[in-house]
Curated annotation (Swiss-Prot):
<keyword id="KW-0687">Ribonucleoprotein</keyword>
<protein>
    <recommendedName>
        <fullName>Large ribosomal subunit protein bL31</fullName>
    </recommendedName>
</protein>
<keyword id="KW-0694">RNA-binding</keyword>
<keyword id="KW-0479">Metal-binding</keyword>
<dbReference type="GO" id="GO:0003735">
    <property type="term" value="F:structural constituent of ribosome"/>
</dbReference>
<feature type="binding site">
    <location>
        <position position="40"/>
    </location>
    <ligand>
        <name>Zn(2+)</name>
    </ligand>
</feature>
<comment type="subunit">
    <text>Part of the 50S ribosomal subunit.</text>
</comment>
<feature type="binding site">
    <location>
        <position position="19"/>
    </location>
    <ligand>
        <name>Zn(2+)</name>
    </ligand>
</feature>
<dbReference type="InterPro" id="IPR042105">
    <property type="entry name" value="Ribosomal_bL31_sf"/>
</dbReference>
<comment type="function">
    <text>Binds the 23S rRNA.</text>
</comment>
<keyword id="KW-0699">rRNA-binding</keyword>
<dbReference type="GO" id="GO:1990904">
    <property type="term" value="C:ribonucleoprotein complex"/>
</dbReference>
<dbReference type="GO" id="GO:0046872">
    <property type="term" value="F:metal ion binding"/>
</dbReference>
<dbReference type="Pfam" id="PF01197">
    <property type="entry name" value="Ribosomal_L31"/>
</dbReference>
<feature type="binding site">
    <location>
        <position position="17"/>
    </location>
    <ligand>
        <name>Zn(2+)</name>
    </ligand>
</feature>
<feature type="binding site">
    <location>
        <position position="37"/>
    </location>
    <ligand>
        <name>Zn(2+)</name>
    </ligand>
</feature>
<dbReference type="GO" id="GO:0006412">
    <property type="term" value="P:translation"/>
</dbReference>
Length: 69
């Protein structure tokens, strides 16, 4: 590798979330600010909402005048 062209790597970079959670990781920046982390994201907290996509087949059949019975 060429000398002097690579950014300095910090093994103890602090990641701060908008919810107040913070943890360390490796990065070329000393501090990272994020809006969502594993402590506040709905997927990880179990408060995830299932999006109902029901009715798509019926809508398709209605659009093309198909009778599935």
């Amino acid at each position: 590798m060429k000398q002097g062209i690579h950014p300095e790597y910090h093994t103890d970079a602090v990641v701060k979330c908008a919810c107040g959670n913070s943890f360390t990781t490796g990065s070329v920046k000393e501090e990272l600010k994020v809006e969502i982390c594993s402590k506040c994201h709905p997927f990880f907290t179990g408060k995830q909402k299932i999006v109902d996509v029901g009715g798509r087949v019926e809508k398709f059949n209605k659009r093309f005048n198909l009778d599935t019975k």
